[in-house]
Design a protein with these regions (language model features):
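Ribonuclease/tRNase effector modules and their secretory precursors
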Residues: 1-91
Length: 91
C-alpha cells in the first residue's frame, strides 16, 4: 500500500486498486509518476454527483489531457480509480 498527501489528508492506494486502474485504464500506467502531484496539488476538485464522499481531483499532465484521480473520503481515504480525460466534470 502506498500513501499520498492530499487536501483531504493522507490517501491510500492499495495493490488491489492499482491493479484495477492498470487493468481498466492501461494508459494511466505511464502517467503513474503524476499521482503524488495530482493528489497533493490538484488544479480542480469536483464532488461526485452520486456519492457526497467521493471527489475527483484533476491535474493537467500533457497538452489537453488531465489525470483524474477518484478518491473516497471517509475514516480511511483511498483511491477508487484513476483515468485520463480531456474534460473536467461540470458542476
Amino acid at each position: 500500500m502506498e500513501r499520498f498527501a492530499s487536501p483531504f489528508g493522507t490517501v491510500e492506494l492499495t495493490a488491489e486498486r492499482e491493479k484495477h486502474i492498470f487493468l481498466f485504464h492501461p494508459e494511466v500506467r505511464k502517467e503513474r509518476k503524476h499521482f503524488p502531484s495530482t493528489l497533493a496539488e490538484p488544479e480542480v476538485i469536483r464532488r461526485s454527483r452520486f456519492d457526497p464522499k467521493v471527489f475527483i481531483l484533476y491535474r493537467a499532465i500533457v497538452q489537453g489531457k488531465y489525470l483524474a484521480i477518484v478518491v473516497k473520503t471517509n475514516h480511511r481515504n483511498f483511491i477508487l480509480t484513476a483515468y485520463l480525460t480531456r474534460n473536467i466534470q461540470q458542476l
